[in-house]
Amino acid sequence: MGTQILSKTTHHLLSVVGKLCVIAIMSEISKLIVDSLKAYYITKEGIVKAVDSVSFEIKGIESFGIAGETASGKSTLGLALLRSLQPPGKIVGGNITLQGQNISNMSDDEFNKTIRWKKIAMVFQGAMNTLDPVYTIGSQMSEIIKEHRVDVEQESLIYNSLMQVGLDPSVSSRYPHELSGGMKQRVVIAMALLLDPDIVIADEPTTALDVLVQAQIIELLKTLRKERGLTVILITHDLNLILEFADKIGIMYAGQLVEFGSANDLYLNPRHPYTQALMASIPRLHSVHKDLQFIAGSSPNMLELLPGCRFFSRCPFAKELCREDPPQIKLEKGFVRCWLYK
């Protein structure tokens, strides 16, 4: 009897150790590598370098947050990863490697058949307001399945996706105007999950929702990440939100990733002057500084970018050397694009 109990205990321990080993291995495997990605808008007025030589890496079970002010290039980066940029937007350089496969040179047809919605999906900014008012939720979800996958049980996929986001499957027979803002946001998240992707890009998923519903949506994304092993790339201007959610954070400014690192490191020890200014602008519970700080000046005109650091005109530490393009300095847990650390 004692031997049987010992055997069961040993088996259980081995099972637990095995699972921990799998998690440890997964955490070291690169799921997404973005190398020197460039996405520009080529207009009559000039070229807008919305995403300019952006590089980062996401490993197996990490969540990634992209923060920055309006027009910093966050949404363009998300669209570029899904290859959903519309003219005059265009990817003009760089590489995207997904789970060891370089997907940058894939034809549009191959990308659509094998990657879009199947491996990478996106909850677009304001997507809940683009649901077609004359079609039921179920019929709109069916269109996604028809476009990207054939010979599958549509009802089963729709049922499972709605259940995963905490909605009753009966929602599929309802129209958008019959749903609350929070329910509509859950619907567009369910749409992104339909074909079981490995990565979901969520662009400002809590915009226009009240505080309670915002918290519910973020908790939903956390749950999906935990239960499905889903990698979520959260794009937002809300630093508090991103610090709460993400393992790693990238700070974008004027089309460039100026700092990248762990959420804890960026919060406790921000390096780039822009990151420092952002962190100083959010309230902290135990801060000795009672007054919030604000960033003077405004972002540069993206059509008239000068050589050098793009934060130059607003930086309190700017020096003559900063008129030259700053190098990307590798740190222990990330990098910073700034001459101060050369």
Residue spans for each PLM region:
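A short, flexible loop at the N-terminus of ABC-type nucleotide-binding domains that lies
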Residues: 28-31, 40-53, 84-89, 107-111, ...
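P-loop NTP-binding/switch modules centered on Walker-like glycine-rich loops
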Residues: 69, 201, 205, 209-290
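ABC ATPase NBD coupling module
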Residues: 90, 103-121, 147, 265-270, ...
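Conserved ABC ATPase "signature" region
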Residues: 102, 153-170, 279
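Short catalytic/signature loops enriched in Gly
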Residues: 172, 262-342
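Conserved ABC ATPase signature
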Residues: 175-179, 183
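A short, proline-enriched helix->beta-strand linker immediately N-terminal to the Walker B motif
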Residues: 194-198
